[in-house]
């Protein structure tokens, strides 16, 4: 995001936010991470894992969950090209991969995440999942976007990582300000958020990357 505005709209994509509200149980959450994953031919296989630690809240009534992750398929996800496998219902157990005898082995309840390019799949950070081996001749690519409860630390502290020019760009529009709020950058004590803040020239090489 410090390079340009290409990803500015990702944290405020309405359907992703609605999914986060539904799973987390309210609006007290923020953007946790954004990353890409490319699985070249012959690679991409992972052991089953969750994206968060044990969750005793899953056993409460009603259950409590810490967040969501999502996959935007930049390539088709097929049976042959290493599509993600997910263990249906695992998020309700409160356990992680530590409960498995062999996280690398097939699981009887696993299902494949399949779809054409452009498909978005949203899932709990507590569900077991993993990439599988890409047996096709082309790289399989996707974007992961995650939202977590606000009391959980971010993968990258967005407020500290944002370059001055990124703050200035986001401050120009209502959507940009909304993006900053979801990213956890709405601290009124941050001098960069003042309307009269002057951006000092800063070489791109010194700007931290989000």
Please report, for each region that a protein language model flagged, where it lies by residue.
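A structural signal for short, well-ordered beta-strand segments
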Residues: 33-36, 70-72, 143-147
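A structural signal for short, well-ordered beta-strand segments and their strand-loop junctions
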Residues: 30-33, 85-86, 122-123
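Catalytic core of non-heme Fe(II) oxygenases with the double-stranded beta-helix
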Residues: 43-113, 153-162
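Short, hydrophobic/aromatic alpha-helical segments in well-folded domains
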Residues: 6, 19, 69-73, 130
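Non-heme Fe(II)-dependent double-stranded beta-helix
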Residues: 1-59
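Short, well-ordered beta-to-alpha junction loops that form the rim of enzyme active sites
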Residues: 34-36, 89, 125-127
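Conserved double-stranded beta-helix
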Residues: 93-98, 102-122, 126-127, 132-210
